[in-house]
Amino acid sequence: MKKTRIRTRYAPSPTGYLHIGGARTALFNYLFAKHFNGDFIVRIEDTDIARNVAGGEESQLDNLEWLQIYPDESPKNPNEKYGKYRQSEKLDRYNEIVEILLKKGLAYKAYDTTYELEKQRAEQIAKGIFSFRYDRNWLKISDEEIKKREVEQTYSIRIALPKNHDYEWNDLVRGLIKVNSEDIGDWVIIKSDKYPTYNFAVVVDDFDMQISHVLRGEEHITNTPKQLAVYEAMGWDKPVFGHLTLITNSKGVKLSKRDDSVKQFISNYKEDGYVSWAISNYLALLGWTSKDTKEIMTKEELIEKFDPERLSASPSKFDMKKMNWYGKHYLQEINKNEIFEYLESLKDKKWLDLFIETFLPNAFSLSELKRELKEYENPMIEKPEIEINDVVKKFKQNLNFENFSVDSIQKAIDKTGTDLNVNGKKLFLPIRLATTFNEHGPELAKAIYLYGKEIIQKRLGNVN
């Protein structure tokens, strides 16, 4: 089969929701395909029935679209020319290929029970072989026992690897990689439950869909020689492989599900009201850089600039501060009506306009704006630990409650500084603490005004 058109794919399992690692993989495959005017495909690897999560497939597809990663083909918009887009719908196709391998003598039925496999593994460990390699000559059972296990269907099917054979590929990211068959051993292609294993099914899928390039995480490097074995056994052209760098936290430690220093699922960002392209823009620069080292890029720019030769093999740090820097940049461009819709506030439009004008410049997500809004919608009146000093007393004296406006508040702040000969933090911090109950915040006069005259009067009520 001659592959001329660039076709890439993202093939998640519906065993969980879209993770930043999976999203980065999908994005790179999308950008790569579109850079070369090719096709980007999403298919679902759902043969691990026990681990599939309800809503897992929908989460993958919906969140990809939210990130503005649109597949040319998927379970939602399949192309019948390339077969099914869910592995669970392709079992007959996998069995067809297995029969070919069995007839060629390139695969065989293995009748080992779980107990016998564990015994074989224990014997290898006793010999100092800690990476298990199946020995096809280990099991000694009678023909009668074989017939019994055949009837009971208690067997798996393994691929028969050639002796001392090198599987090698020129990795797009890491260069030439070579693995010998003696370091792999015959591996299972059809499990005893008659479902295909990942490393077998994925090759059939990639061949059927004419995938030209496979970009995926570095954890798949050990899978690649196994997959090459299937390509060679079937006499199929193999795709170009590229294994993307690991994503770590800001300290360089591999991400784990218990690591709360990073928002790890795309749905978290969606729920928190991040602008979707902020995430995509940041993910695009985890393991890849443009020649001009530009950081803010539209989708069109990324597609144009996505040179695979600039993929990095060094681990990429996911820094929430940097992520929020992107969030802040893109939030400034959002349509104000979207903000109103997300905030769901009963405040009048004029007040909301000023609130957004005041808090938006420092916000990185809509949920952050909503948190600030709650402080104004449900304000505390007293905060006992607030210390009242001369600055606050003078500010209260200078504040004109009869003409309560942003301008009058600013004049009161300025006059207080002049009267007491103070400025900077010594001026602003006591006033901010006494009026807003916060150490930090946006432009002080606006932050005070948004609470309204009555709340500020009550908060300054005990100041004499």
Swiss-Prot record:
Name of the gene: gltX
PROSITE patterns in alphabetical order: AA_TRNA_LIGASE_I
Gene Ontology MF: a single term: zinc ion binding
Superkingdom assignment: Bacteria
GO CC terms, sorted: cytosol
Protein species of origin: Mycoplasma mobile (strain ATCC 43663 / 163K / NCTC 11711)
Function: Catalyzes the attachment of glutamate to tRNA(Glu) in a two-step reaction: glutamate is first activated by ATP to form Glu-AMP and then transferred to the acceptor end of tRNA(Glu).
Residues where ATP binds: 257
Record text on subunit structure and interactions: Monomer.
Main location: cytoplasm
Reaction catalyzed: tRNA(Glu) + L-glutamate + ATP = L-glutamyl-tRNA(Glu) + AMP + diphosphate
Entry similarity comment: Belongs to the class-I aminoacyl-tRNA synthetase family. Glutamate--tRNA ligase type 1 subfamily.
Motif ('KMSKS' region): 254-258
CDD domains for the chain: GluRS_core (cd00808)
Transmembrane segments: none
E.C. number: 6.1.1.17
Keyword terms of this UniProt record: Aminoacyl-tRNA synthetase, ATP-binding, Cytoplasm, Ligase, Nucleotide-binding, Protein biosynthesis
Subcellular location: Cytoplasm
Name this protein carries in UniProt: Glutamate--tRNA ligase
Any GO BP annotation: glutamyl-tRNA aminoacylation
